[in-house]
Amino acid sequence: MLSNPKPAKVMVTGASGLLGSWVCRELLDQGTEVIAVGQRTPLHEALATYRVRLDLCDREMLDSLFQQFQPSAVIHMAALADPTLCEEQPLLSRRLNIEVSRQIAQRCQSTGIPMAFTSTDLVFDGDRGNYLESDSVSPINRYGEHKAEAEQAIHNACPHAVIFRMPFMFGEGLYHPSPMRQWLDHLSQDKPLFGFSDELRSSVDYQTAAAGIVKLHTALRGEILHLGGIETLSRLMLMRSIASAFGYNPQKIEAKVQADMTFRAARPRDVSLDSRKARAMGYKTPFLADIMHRLVKGTDFSDI
């Protein structure tokens, strides 16, 4: 069901993250006031109207945050997103990924404002790929388990909330170096680098994902949407495509398979997402070659 036009003041948690900072920029570019919330490093003043350092686990401070700023919508992206850390610190993962999400959802419900939440493709087991929004979740690591639990907690507390399941993302960071930049630094210094040929994702860049979140976060109520890219490719293929686009020899990136390594957190084989539902609603996903061109040339897709 369609709702009202985009709100004038949006609270963004996890605002200093790689995706969060792009979401803040997209909101500002469309004239929206941004309340950027982070626990450690405040977002640069050019990317937010208001900047707040806050421990989201502090319920009293969370109440004060809503009372003081009275947001017209919330995009909740703060999370403990490292699967290994989630395995090593399960209580912290549960607190940050589930309980904080539940608390924010309850406040959005009580104040009657739209909420959007970024989940992950890792809620699926990766046995077949090309997952639809209606497919049952079946996570195989703790991060995926806790994000799946967070989805349900949010739905129970705030039934109108929109849940975005995000793929593996890449691109330049607005606030701090991204994994892609680290890969390129390794290549420039002839340091060893490898990618898995049997780990498949429907990857997309941060800017494209952020534009989709901003476009759709108040357009629907109570929906789950997949915001994957058009193409499914292995991590190795993605890394080699990036290397080639930036003028490096892609063969310098060694091919490995998951069986070559031992991981604390299980890694699914193919968690590619079917994102046709979001694209039908206006989510614009360029082909990988076009994304690479923009990353190298510094152009964008705002007019597509």
Predicted regions and their residues:
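Conserved C-terminal active-site "lid" loop/helix of NAD(P)H-dependent oxidoreductases
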Residues: 234-240, 257-304
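NAD(P)H-binding glycine-rich loop region in Rossmannoid oxidoreductase-like domains
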Residues: 53-96
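Catalytic helix-loop patch of NAD(P)-dependent Rossmann-fold dehydrogenases
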Residues: 95, 99-103, 123-164, 170
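Mid/C-terminal beta-alpha module of Rossmann-like enzyme folds, strongest
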Residues: 210-213, 219-264, 303-304
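Glycine/proline-rich active-site loop of Rossmann-fold NAD(P)-dependent oxidoreductases
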Residues: 148, 170-181, 189-191, 207, ...
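N-terminal Rossmann NAD(P)H-binding glycine-rich loop of SDR-like oxidoreductase domains
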Residues: 8-30
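NAD(P)-dependent short-chain dehydrogenase/reductase
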Residues: 152-201
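NAD(P)-cofactor binding segment of oxidoreductase domains
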Residues: 88-116
